[in-house]
Amino acid sequence: MKVNAKSDHKLLPKVTKVVAKGDAKGKKVNKAWLHDHINDPYVKQARKEGYRARAAFKLKEMDETLGLIKPGDCVVDLGSTPGAWSQYVRRKLSPTGAAVGALNGRIIGLDLLPMEPIEGVVFIQGDFREPEVLAKLEQALSTEKGPVKVDLVISDMAPNLSGIESADAARIAHLVELAVEFAQTRMKPDGALVVKLFHGSGYDDLVKLFQASFKVVKRMKPKASRPNSSETFLVGRGLKNVTPV
């Protein structure tokens, strides 16, 4: 479910001139951010490898560290737009690591906003809490032997941060709780959930939520996550309580 434009999720084209609105201080800040973004090694690498966003390398590091994605897996990407995480999963589930061709597994992306097609990825636009969206999800998970359970749920969902700590903490917590609830109803008992969150008010409570929901919990700060960002990730493996659909 796409809640906002993720700060680093759209690669910018080469820029020869920067025009920033606002006062002189704002212009300097915008120019500094744009300079850092354009020269970011992960942005350059994402462009080189054909990823839609540098965020692909965050999931890549977590996967390589923890072995999250395996051949034949069914993966659901919550808040999938613009598609970098789905792109990475698609390549990981390819027998040859390719962006096209054979696929050994199943990938479903869900988001409020539209997403450009990715070969092999089933995309469903809408709120995954709504009945009509859930019906499409059920169809995407169906097989001749019946519906399949999900091996991995990944969520890079993030709210627009207002700067008001209490309000931001509530929005972040809500998205994490939605992802946990989704995993509890759709995931295999030995599956895994990856969510993004931010250090600050409410962080410890979300860690406790994960610890109450999963047998193993890992805190991750991938190298591709900007050092000056409070962004971090939680990975939960093995459901403690399985909720029937």
UniProtKB/Swiss-Prot annotation:
SUPFAM superfamilies: S-adenosyl-L-methionine-dependent methyltransferases (SSF53335). The active site is at K196 (proton acceptor). The keyword Nucleotide-binding does not apply. S-adenosyl-L-methionine binds at G83, W85, D111, D127, D156. It comes from the Bacteria. Keywords: Cytoplasm, Methyltransferase, rRNA processing, S-adenosyl-L-methionine, Transferase. Belongs to the class I-like SAM-binding methyltransferase superfamily. RNA methyltransferase RlmE family. The keyword Ribonucleoprotein does not apply. GO terms for cellular component: cytoplasm. PANTHER family: RIBOSOMAL RNA METHYLTRANSFERASE, RRNA METHYLTRANSFERASE 2, MITOCHONDRIAL. It is found in: Cytoplasm. Specifically methylates the uridine in position 2552 of 23S rRNA at the 2'-O position of the ribose in the fully assembled 50S ribosomal subunit. HAMAP family: RNA_methyltr_E (MF_01547). It catalyses: uridine(2552) in 23S rRNA + S-adenosyl-L-methionine = 2'-O-methyluridine(2552) in 23S rRNA + S-adenosyl-L-homocysteine + H(+). The gene is rlmE. This is Ribosomal RNA large subunit methyltransferase E. It comes from Polaromonas naphthalenivorans (strain CJ2). GO terms for molecular function: rRNA (uridine-2'-O-)-methyltransferase activity. Its EC number is 2.1.1.166.
